[in-house]
Amino acid sequence: MVQSVLGSLVLGYRPLWGRERSLVGIQLFVRSDGAAQVDVAHLLHTLQEIWSASSPPLLLTPQTRQLLGDMLAHAPRNAPWICVPGPWLAESAVYASVQAAHQRGLRLVWRGELGNLPEPDIARCFDNSLLSLRPEDAVAALQAAPPARPGAPPVAPQGTSPVIDGQMYENVASRALMEHCLDQHKALALAGWPVEDVLYSLRHQQMQPAHAIILKLLKAIEAEQSLEIFEDILSEDPLLAYRFMV
């Protein structure tokens, strides 16, 4: 049965990173495979079965209005967070489904641009937001809290940051903006990571495996754990995994 319901879907994922720079959740994108009818109730039950208590929380992100409507209608109260695109709420059917789901106790996340927040009567239906930063938002945020540069005098802040405390953010393109969201405004999570900017800032440094993973591996070796345990630990660090593969 698991194979049948997952076989009718196209799935994608994106890590959600927290203030400790560790994984705090997974955004799971869900789309039906062609014209196949998706049994959403069965899908939610399957996820509940295969997702253990130690697994990171899920943010379900349906890619079609039909899937969203089915999730809002059939999800139980203890279901994962469900992401709702802000522009879709202009349709009365979607808005009515969101209101009904909120009244049933579902945890909903509004997704849209920081500069186009929902009205209060809509916002109260949502537990959190996944906000997209526009270029002008990024500029305003960094001007309000200019990042320190080694050897340079501090720059006076200009204006106030548009970043809202405690929300989730996406389209964060720079390391400085990432630190601004997570550290200064206590963002709940960052969807994705400013990979290109981080790699560029480390271009002259030789990367090393994470110290915590090395210690964990040494303890497993001392305890004479199985090869499977060693492989699991190695897989937690990309650099270690690559070195042992080659």
Q: Residue spans of the language-model regions?
A:
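Bacterial c-di-GMP phosphodiesterase EAL domain
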Residues: 1-81, 86-100
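Flexible, active-site-proximal loop/turn residues at the rims of small-molecule/cofactor binding pockets
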Residues: 32, 88, 135, 173, ...
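Hydrophobic transmembrane alpha-helix bundles
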Residues: 41-45, 90-106, 147-152, 230-234
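Catalytic beta/alpha-barrel core
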Residues: 59-63, 80-90, 105-115, 127-138, ...
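A short acidic, amphipathic alpha-helical/loop segment
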Residues: 70-73, 93-100, 118-123, 140-145, ...
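Glycine-enriched alpha-helix->loop->beta-strand junction motifs that scaffold or abut catalytic
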Residues: 77-81, 103-108, 123-130, 159-163, ...
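Bacterial c-di-GMP phosphodiesterase catalytic domain signature
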Residues: 90-92, 114-161
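Conserved alpha-helical "signature site"
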Residues: 146-246
